[in-house]
Amino acid sequence: MLHPRARTMLLLSLPAVAIGIASSLILIMVMKIASVLQNLLWQRLPGTLGIAQDSPLWIIGVLTLTGIAVGLVIRFSQGHAGPDPACEPLIGAPVPPSALPGLIVALILGLAGGVSLGPEHPIMTVNIALAVAIGARLLPRVNRMEWTILASAGTIGALFGTPVAAALIFSQTLNGSNEVPLWDRLFAPLMAAAAGALTTGLFFHPHFSLPIAHYGQMEMTDILSGAIVAAIAIAAGMVAVWCLPRLHAMMHQMKNPVFVLGIGGLILGILGVIGGPVSLFKGLDEMQQMVANQAFSTSDYFLLAVIKLAALVVAAASGFRGGRIFPAVFVGVALGLMLHEHVPAVPAAITVSCAILGIVLVVTRDGWLSLFMAAVVVPNTTLLPLLCIVMLPAWLLLAGKPMMMVNRQKQQPPHDNV
């Protein structure tokens, strides 16, 4: 016979698995549709018209029209495509289901159009809203927070292709007590995360790891080098943190989201022309291309890091629906490669992983997620002790510093003004 604690954990197992599978399927559906539309916009259509896909006019035109299209969706769809991600954390309160169709359309347009944001925030919003709405009807005795946690865990597992990230993140939020141990609370979320990760793995495997030279034995000088790299990445990230609310306030002085996002798309197009096609989109596939291109120099990596960080700030400030983690990882990779090219004595594995750790820590202010992203992009167990040590001064640098979010009390998203 099972202990009552075990029966309690099993109670939510079936809903957790169902939510994990559904979270993954929603992500896969959105990414597949966005991929088809992206291929149409950036491959087939310019080929049919006899235009080079990296033509400055094409890049500027597509991104400007993408901004206008997303602005129209936000302006006229029911629920105005959900909350402005610039004003929200990754895991937020559930939104009304009526806002989800507009949010999904806005996300797909942004992903396909080359906007420098990832899918993580909108997908998280969609999955939480559906889990809470459906769960409240099927099992009304289960509170909304439980559904939110399960949907969040399932989405994280689906996004990263592993339940490890969910385990790390929720281990610091689901604090155990004398009555309910931590792993009792983690049981159902990990079931959801595992189901989400396994479902994603049936269709495609998220490819985060980069072909970077293996790092051998850790030395004391490597710790100092890693801490300096992380500090440089944090400094770059804090510039973006300073710029985001100010640019957001300036752009949203225009009350119509069509104008705001149209101008934002135009700026993104200009940045895309400067940085080239590799600086567009969410950044995961593009960072693979960046590492594979042996022709890039120190100045090229620096330019890509600056352009991508600027594009991230502009896209978020304009109100595009998307997340900031994936493009931040691209920035970290570009910074790390730049620093390695500048000081070849420091291994690329250290510069890239520590730069990712620093920039993701700025964006998420989540130590476990930052460690996870650094370790998964540069998969080397020898680096783990070094990353844990480097995290300490990095965390000290960011203690009490503002987060990469807009204070919603000072600045409302555009759809609240129409």
UniProtKB/Swiss-Prot annotation:
Q: Organism source for this protein?
A: Escherichia coli O1:K1 / APEC
The protein's matches in Pfam families, at most eight in alphabetical order, are given as: Voltage_CLC
Family classification: Belongs to the chloride channel (TC 2.A.49) family.
Query: Looking at the UniProt record for this protein, which Gene Ontology cellular component terms does it annotate, in alphabetical order?
Result: plasma membrane
Ranges that cross the membrane: 10-30, 54-74, 99-119, 120-140, 149-169, 186-206, 223-243, 258-278, 300-320, 322-342, 343-363, 371-391
What protein name is recorded for this chain?
Putative ion-transport protein YfeO
Q: GO molecular function: any one?
A: chloride transmembrane transporter activity
The keyword Nucleotide-binding is assigned to this record: no
Q: Which InterPro entries match?
A: Chloride_channel_YfeO, Cl-channel_core, ClC, ClC-type_chloride_channel
Gene3D superfamilies the record matches: Clc chloride channel (1.10.3080.10)
UniProt keyword Nucleotide-binding, yes or no: no
Quote the PANTHER family the UniProt record gives.
Answer: CHLORIDE CHANNEL PROTEIN CLC-E (PTHR43427), ION-TRANSPORT PROTEIN YFEO-RELATED (PTHR43427:SF9)
Compartments annotated for it: namely: Cell membrane
Going by the entry's taxonomy, the superkingdom of the source organism is recorded as Bacteria
Look up and give the membrane topology term: Multi-pass membrane protein
Key words of the record: Cell membrane, Ion channel, Ion transport, Membrane, Transmembrane, Transmembrane helix, Transport
Major subcellular site: membrane
